[in-house]
Amino acid sequence: MAATRTASRACEIFTTLEYGPAPESHACALAWLDTQDRHLGHYVNGQWLKPEHRSSVPCQDPITGENLASCLQAQSEDVAAAVEAARASLENWSTQPGAIRAQHLTRLAKVIQKHQRLLWTLESLVTGRAVREVRDRDVPLAQQLLQYHAVQAHTQEEALAGWEPMGVIGLILSPTFPFLDMMWRICPALAVGCTVVVLVPPASPTPLLLAQLAGELGPFPGILNVISGPASLGPVLAAQPGVQKVAFCGAIEEGRALRRTLAGWVPELGLALGAESLLLLTEVADVDSAVEGIVDAAWSDRSPGGLRLLIQEAVWDETMRRLQERMGRLRCGHGLDGAVDMGARGAAARDLAQRYVSEAQSQGAQVFQAGSEPSDSPFFPPTLVSDLPPASPCTQAEVPWPLVVASPFRTAKEALAVANGTPRGGSASVWSERLGQALELAYGLQVGTVWINAHGLRDPAVPTGGCKESGSSWHGGQDGLYEYLRPSGTPAWIPYLSKTLNYDAFGLALPSTLPAGPETGPAPPYGLFVGGRFQAPGARSSRPIQDSQGSLQGYVAEGGAKDIRGAVEAAHQAAPGWMSQSPAARAALLWALAAALQRREPNLVSRLERHGVELKVAKAEVELSVKRLRAWGARVQAQGCALQVAELRGPVLRLREPLGVLAIVCPDEWPLLAFVSLLAPALAHGNTVVLVPSGACPIPALEVCQEMATLLPAGLVNVVTGDRDHLTRCLALHQDIQALWYFGSAQGSQFVEWASAGNLKPVWVNRGCPRAWDQEAEGAGPELGRRAARTKALWLPMGD
């Protein structure tokens, strides 16, 4: 009888082909928690730190609600102790030969391999993610990251000559993927010689386990320190002496708030924000493969966020039908069950998804869900949102996990307009069997990473990042290394925060312009150079410029907000044409401008002399300006893309794309040379520019504009003169400027960092410190080229 029942059950299984449970034991994770008495503290300087009189939060299984342990909440004293440990270890670690650092990273990779079951079980248990994703993707990728960066450390002395480690790095993680996000960022930082303090969200034990494994390796215990606490401790971490950079990974609004809070505190803030991705499906795509790509992009536990799906109208109905059928076969369950597709990410993620669905329905959207879950269930079913009106607020809001928001499009041009119409620019995939069409769409998308007929591929050697509100920091590849390096000889930055700075009043009012006294001769008035010609300012006001003897040298226009608006509009109109120019065409224009400056040398030297510059220095400044234009013209020819081979078959193109409209506020020192040194790399990399020249001596820059009026396309370069603080305010608050370089006062630098949080534009400020523009390293070094363009990784996987 028993044999009959067994045979019947086996027959039923083969008939229905239903999944059965495949649970993964979590005994090893609980055993590790028991070694800490289920009470986790912080891991600092190679040992556990469990101070008294600290509040704690429970670490729970997000699916069952079982209390696994308690985690201490850090306070400012704990943050200070972690930073002090990192500072004490910095000199020893950063001065080690690259080969020694490589050996240490390789040993850590072997330790992770040895304890991989403990790592994947603990990560799945506390995050709720499917164990097969952590086991088959996260942990192997962590080992690959360490091995790749060990190789980079070994070759650092030759490959990264002229660069040095920043110092102590502060890292603030999000609760979604704390283990993998931490690995992406600590590997390059440690490889180049930095030490790290990681602030992990409460109840995130996996980073603490990793820190323990690293600390037990021996000779360098303080290079990696992990403390547990809320993101509100970020300003406390940034304010610690010696912290040279803060890298934040999390929600967009949290990053925006952190940008405002840390203005004036730290020299560098790297932001990796949001988790939404985009999938663009054309009418010539393999629909079956694309549907599986959608599942991987949105409803697998490798996806950090939701998906915005654009489908060409010709295949809309067929794709939606197949997608809904595929959704019905997805399995939700406990993350430690090896047969589930989706786990649960806690009440906060579930509530966020439910709010988005409710708002979308109230705005007229159709919602399809694969199954239903009770209101008290930890799971949120896979959800497909469609028919959302184009003007509804949800079309601009970030899509949370596990939602897919689908919209149709007709032509490739319309698809790019819709895709680029959101303020985010993280990652995207293009699905098309026509390679030419796929490449055209991939090049047109304003994102950091594009996959062709695939989604979510990762490789340590390939840079990953974003643009716009997704942040401008990178990890992986050479770009990830430069995130933690600075040019050799750069002094360590100290906080320059001005607590008396009134952000609401800075640069708000224009100073009164008074007559300069009796005119001894004709003083030529200079207008604003906007749209390829000189024009009068909107305020119909000019300011006198006096020479070193107090005599009137000329009048320049007093620009304002209206003039900045016109300059930005002109730059946007010129941008498509200039970006599409070949490197040879851009080089020819830069060389032509250099020749024009050389012809105008006597006049420029005379202008500089009247400003108080010695004749010899003035001649050298003009000659060096000509040299800079020719040098960047030559470097244009070397631009292009680099081919990176990844582990998956198929190349990855590393493209360097223009930032877009770049605003530059020039310093007062070296009025001509600094102007040219900042303008040349911006033009060489395909940007259109809005410049504010030296306030004390703007006339040499305006003399150059007379040559640009006949040589350059209209709107390519726009020069607005006036009060520096007022124009800086207008530029920093402008939402259609893609990047801003500021070289002025410390207060101006602080305001620029604060105001840039509006559209999260990347900024480069000097914090009130002068720069040696006549030196090659600071006036024409690789840092300017790196700042003048952004990276895009374009994946081209091969195979059926």
Curated annotation (Swiss-Prot):
Q: Which InterPro entries match?
A: Ald_DH/histidinol_DH (IPR016161), Ald_DH_C (IPR016163), Ald_DH_N (IPR016162), Aldehyde_DH (IPR011408), Aldehyde_DH_dom (IPR015590)
List the molecular function annotations (GO) for this entry: aldehyde dehydrogenase (NAD+) activity
Organism superkingdom: Eukaryota
Q: Name one Pfam family in it.
A: Aldedh
Q: Which family does it belong to?
A: Belongs to the aldehyde dehydrogenase family.
Q: How does it assemble?
A: Interacts with SPG21.
The name of this protein is Aldehyde dehydrogenase family 16 member A1
Corresponding gene? ALDH16A1
